[in-house]
Amino acid sequence: MPGRGIRSFMALCTAGAVACLLSAGLAANAQDREIKVGYMKNPIQDASLDMMEKWAKGHNVKLTRVPMAYSVFMEKVTATLTSGADQFDIIWHNDDWGQLWKKWLDTTDDIKGIDNADQWPLLAFWNDDRKLTVVPMAHTVGTFFYRSDLLRPEEVPTTFAQLVSISQRLQKEGKVKWGYVGGMSMNNTWFSLWWTMWANNCDILKPLFERDNAKLAAARFEPAVTEPCHREIVEFWWDAINTHKISPPGMTAYGRNEANAIFMAGDAAFTLVDSTHFGEFNDPKRSKIVGKVGMAPFPIGPRANKPTSWNEIWGWAIPKGVPAGRAKLAKEMLSGMMTDDAGQIEMWKKTGGPPPNIKLWPKLAAEDKDFAALKHAVFDQTPITHSAYYFAEWPAVHKAYSDMAIAALSGKREDIPKVLAEHVDNIQRAATGN
């Protein structure tokens, strides 16, 4: 009996050990079949994730979404990247911080379908070895929106002067409270100051429109903010708010959400924001102007003779700290997204996010009047430059610029040249890291 008891005990121990090993192996395998995505909660990112989810379900992969607020996203993900942790297998990527993250990201040249992406918006995402570090999610393009129930296409303003006069007419007729509303606060500069800056043949640094970092450095990152072309756009917005009163007096503090809310309430005739908000404007639960929104090229300033545009992307990236097995799986999932034509078309219809596969654009333009309008407003226009700079100190430059612009718009009109000049050194120091 004692001998049989010992043998039985040893057999149980062996069986238990085997079971533990099998369980550990299954757990490890299950972990390897899970992909965690860190992203900003946003309809277009959710639509892109829906395509990945479809692929994941068909390949026995668990997709875990980890949403974060925009205000904490960059800081949190940067900390993860620099520590080499594998908290996320895929992360949302943006041209604003493309150069900041390039050395911590896996390359994506081997993603299936990447050759169907537009090359222009990829400038921010090449690493020092000239390897790509992004997979496009959707194009984020500045789009001039107007109330199509108030204006026929041929009546839409094509110049800054017409934007003022038509806004005032619509206000006088009692059709809108405001002519133009757009974001203007830090991180929303594109939707007022910057689109008009580029539309007036101007830029932030010299040489104008240059994005080659070596050439910018050779020019000592000299600000262009005291140039007449730049002073004119600050004066334009001062007048829009204080003299012509076509824009709200509090607009210097508006982000895109505040501006969008006014536009969707039917209180403004015009706005400019990323096309990805087109879906919001046509959401009956949020908007009073469903089916009443048109798109047109940017109105131009006195120094320009044709419209410009900006055409950038949101994307996905894979951190270098991700174990090889999961990185391979992440690439397969992103390949599935890039080759899902039906999913990309559905993303456009639901959110207004133009597909990353540009070979779909002609078909969409032929079949969808809204995409045809967007194509005319943005993709048929030639961008004068990229809508950001791609050196590591760019976020600091953006902040210094925003401080300058808000200070100038908050003071007296006659003081604008002085305020711009006073901030030149701050912008230059931000650019050089001093």
Where do the protein language model's features map onto the residues?
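C-terminal segment of classical bacterial N-terminal signal peptides
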Residues: 19-28
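Extracytoplasmic "Venus flytrap"/periplasmic binding protein-like
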Residues: 33, 54-120, 133, 149-158, ...
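Conserved C-terminal helix/tail region of periplasmic/extracytoplasmic solute-binding proteins
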Residues: 33-34, 57-58, 62, 172, ...
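Short, polar/charged alpha-helical segment
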Residues: 41-62, 234, 401
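Hinge/lid segment of periplasmic solute-binding proteins
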Residues: 94-142, 158, 162-166, 192, ...
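Glycine-centered hinge/linker elements that transmit conformational signals in sensory
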Residues: 167, 211-251
